[in-house]
């Protein structure tokens, strides 16, 4: 065998995936693989047995998911290049934008391809400690649209809203965040098809409060 190589414990991987599948089955939610965190496509066939699809942070990850992982394909990027939109609209089921301006500019192409457009929001609710520089809800963050920046006129273009504010955290942080999301954006929920809770949920960690997650 050629070295170096990556060695995956399939039994451990499946144990974690079983935990996630249990959450899916008990709640009806969808769980996606965040390729930014794990993109070893050799095990994508195993992951596809348990999860609903994958998320991408740009065109190349979107291609990888389309080629190697059966299921839904979602993409979010802080900004898109105009020339990438046609391929993203072909490859992805959901294309999530970071600003109302990019949504207005590119969502019509996504909708014309029969796909769904979303918008990342900033609930302005920080639950992280020790690494404020990475906090999407931190001061001067450009990740997501605040309520003050949100323009209700874009609602006809939207299928859903997306937030990503956690980092390897427990479900109490999600509960706090959801309260803030509902307080700031709840008035728009009735017209939406979905709400994406983003990543950073350490669900497979020993001691994670899964019942609380499922109540959320």
Which residue ranges define each predicted feature?
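Generic N-terminal amphipathic, Lys/Arg-enriched alpha-helix
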Residues: 1-7
């Amino acid at each position: 065998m050629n070295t170096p190589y990556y060695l995956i414990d399939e039994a451990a991987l499946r144990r974690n995936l079983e935990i996630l599948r249990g959450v899916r089955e008990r709640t009806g939610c969808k769980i996606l693989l965040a390729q930014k965190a794990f993109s070893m496509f050799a095990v994508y066939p195993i992951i596809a047995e348990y999860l609903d699809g994958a998320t991408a942070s740009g065109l190349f990850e979107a291609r990888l998911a389309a080629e190697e992982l059966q299921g839904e394909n979602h993409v979010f990027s802080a900004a898109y290049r105009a020339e990438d939109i046609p391929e993203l609209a072909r490859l992805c089921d959901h294309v999530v934008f970071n600003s109302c301006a990019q949504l207005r500019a590119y969502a019509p192409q996504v909708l014309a391809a029969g796909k769904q457009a979303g918008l990342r929001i900033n609930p302005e609710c920080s639950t992280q400690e020790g690494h404020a520089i990475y906090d999407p809800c931190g001061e001067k963050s450009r990740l997501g649209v605040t309520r003050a920046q949100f323009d209700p006129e874009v609602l006809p273009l939207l299928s859903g809203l997306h937030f990503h504010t956690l980092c390897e955290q427990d479900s109490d942080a999600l509960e706090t965040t959801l309260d803030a999301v509902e307080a700031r954006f709840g008035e728009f929920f009735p017209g939406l098809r979905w709400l994406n809770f983003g990543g950073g949920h350490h669900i497979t960690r020993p001691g994670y409060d899964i019942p609380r997650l499922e109540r959320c």
